[in-house]
Amino acid sequence: EFHQLLKLSVKAGEILFFLTDVPIRLKSGTKLIVDNLIFYSDGRYEFIDVKGALTPVFLLKKKQVEDAYPLKIKIAKKKGKRWSIY
């Protein structure tokens, strides 16, 4: 469903394009695959991972990646019929 929302945003011109299943590797060999890397028409970009439940493993890898690189991984969760991104 989030994928469909991204497609609609591309058609509306809000998003230029997006990549899915983007691997981010750490020197330790740890890898986190982020669901979406979104490139907006105003030049911004965001990493957004769609989650039902936040597992301890995901939270640990997210922290390791954010500590190692100058990026922030946002979380998308569906609440009712709306998406919440934080």
Can you say where each PLM-predicted feature lies in the sequence?
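Electrostatic, structured charged patches in enzyme active sites and in nucleic-acid/phosphate-binding
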Residues: 1-86
